[in-house]
Amino acid sequence: MKGVTVVDHPLVQHKLTIMRKKETSTAGFRRLLREISLLLGYEVTRNLELTTTTIETPIETMEAPTLEGKKLVFASVLRAGNGLLEGLLDLVPAARVAHIGLYRDHETLEAVEYFFKAPSDLADRLVIVVDPMLATANSAIAAIDKLKGRGATNIRFLCLLAAPEGIERFTKAHPDVPVFTASIDRQLNEKGYIMPGLGDAGDRMYGTK
């Protein structure tokens, strides 16, 4: 599917299977989400630009590769995005962080914004938006609309699961934003949940209903 990368690494798929199981505990779900975010983060940052810098090893001076330009921004779609955020910050501790508060109106399935906080220099940074589920895509589209409105031009979207309906809507709304996911599931149900899915990621992370 154009613009969509499915990360099919065996460890990603194994951990995702355990996360899908309804008997997986809240603690286990959180731990697995953090672990899988590290593996997904490796893929979403694969083609970051490098430059060279002169360093001293214990043996000699050398020209060594280092990330070029300003560091990343990880933009977490609250609240479930924070589960992916924690692992990504382990991978890139110097990254800046944006928080986008959105909730889904269960009647209309539309995204409603209640919070936004981001670095001021988004135009100068790669922004990786993280949200475990790309279901209806309403929240993802709204989040990226907001980021673009604040100057972001280089954006990627990282999720755990995606539905075909969500991918179609998202890529039409933001064809310039590549999507990285661990799985494209079968479809959405009448309530807008991904099937077979893993349930509500936020509820499973925090033990809420």
UniProtKB/Swiss-Prot annotation:
Pathway: Pyrimidine metabolism; UMP biosynthesis via salvage pathway; UMP from uracil: step 1/1. CDD domains: PRTases_typeI. Binds 1 Mg(2+) ion per subunit. The magnesium is bound as Mg-PRPP. It comes from Mesorhizobium japonicum (strain LMG 29417 / CECT 9101 / MAFF 303099). Its EC number is 2.4.2.9. Allosterically activated by GTP. The gene is upp. GO terms for biological process: UMP salvage; uracil salvage. GO terms for molecular function: GTP binding; magnesium ion binding; uracil phosphoribosyltransferase activity. Belongs to the UPRTase family. It catalyses: UMP + diphosphate = 5-phospho-alpha-D-ribose 1-diphosphate + uracil. 5-phospho-alpha-D-ribose 1-diphosphate binds at residues 79, 104, 131-139, 200. Its cofactor is Mg(2+). InterPro entries: PRibTrfase_dom, PRTase-like, Upp_B, UPRTase/APRTase, Ura_phspho_trans. This is Uracil phosphoribosyltransferase.
